[in-house]
Amino acid sequence: MREKIDKRIPRYTSLIMPTFLALKELGGSGKNNEILDQIIKDLQISDEVVDIQHKGRTDKSELSYQADWARTYLSRYGVIENSARGVYTLSSPQL
């Protein structure tokens, strides 16, 4: 059974469009932490929510974990590319 996460944390499905928009705002390319910082800024997510840790881990926040999945789905559908380790780029400049 899946563990429930704090309801204040956006799920990956609701972070897909903000991730895409963050990459556009970053000029079409960004590192994982830059993308996450832009999402936090755009969605005005409080520090309290940002600091909630992913279950069983002390090195990753739940928000970061959910953002990782949003990037994974965008990548699977060809919207973004993992151009280098920890760097994502929009697949087409026209997007």
Where do the protein language model's features map onto the residues?
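Minor-groove-contacting beta-hairpin "wing" of winged helix-turn-helix DNA-binding domains
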Residues: 86-91
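Short, hydrophobic-biased segments on the C-terminal half of alpha helices
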Residues: 71-72
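Short, amphipathic alpha-helical interaction segments positioned at domain boundaries
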Residues: 93-95
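Positively charged, polyanion-binding regions of nucleic-acid-associated proteins
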Residues: 2-33
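Short, positively charged loop/turn segments that connect secondary-structure elements
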Residues: 8-10, 40-68
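A short, conserved structural fragment
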Residues: 75-85
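The feature represents the first ordered module of a protein
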Residues: 22-24, 36, 59-62
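Short, solvent-exposed beta-strand-terminating loops
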Residues: 29-43
